[in-house]
Amino acid sequence: MKIDPVTFEVDASGGTRPVYVWEAPVRVWHWLMAVAMFAMIITGYLIGRPLVSNLGDTWITYDFGYVRMVHFAAGLFFTALFIYRLFGGAGGTRYGRMFFFPPLLSMKWWKGVFAQVAYYLFMRKSAPEYAGHNPLAQLAMFAMFVLGSFVIIITGLALYAQSWGWDTSWMAWFGWVFVLFGDAQAVRPVHHVMMYVFILFSIAHIYMSFREDVMGGATTLSSMSTGLRMFKEDHHG
């Protein structure tokens, strides 16, 4: 079995073998990020659309205060995990690093993107198999998750700095975000819209993981538990 060094496309003409794609630190990072994103989305939605009633006076129950506290904690945890992975703290094979730095200048890679799109649009009967993420998945993760994380992190940290006050170190570090966007009222909707981008990304990610596991030629769900990607012999004929 041969693996293309640029796209990681698998040539299974000579048989297949398991490929170790996700190291243990990457798998742990993946599930911790999932927990952080879930907490951010739930509490972020409640911040954007607060509950209209509660079981007592707000100064006694402190419900919204707890929601904000969980949101801030999850956001800071998410930020720490993102920075940790971005700078290689979680290690990872070349497959795990690729969606952070996809080969955007490679025509071979872009052909793989369009081939995958054609497959999902039922314009071709099959698509190549890849040791890591396919090129379209890499592009989606880079655009929606990596770039989206940059936006949601800087806007989130700016809004968090605002809660501390204008004469604080937090504002000294992140006050430039308000200057960049114009004011706080411009930052807030951008941050909120990114929540919906993350929701769409999560739904697509989960759906495609199940779909590829069932219809594709390689395991997807189990690989994030074991680290191994197995290829189906019958799928390759």
Predicted regions and their residues:
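Membrane-embedded alpha-helical bundles that constitute the cytochrome b-like, heme-associated redox core
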Residues: 1-237
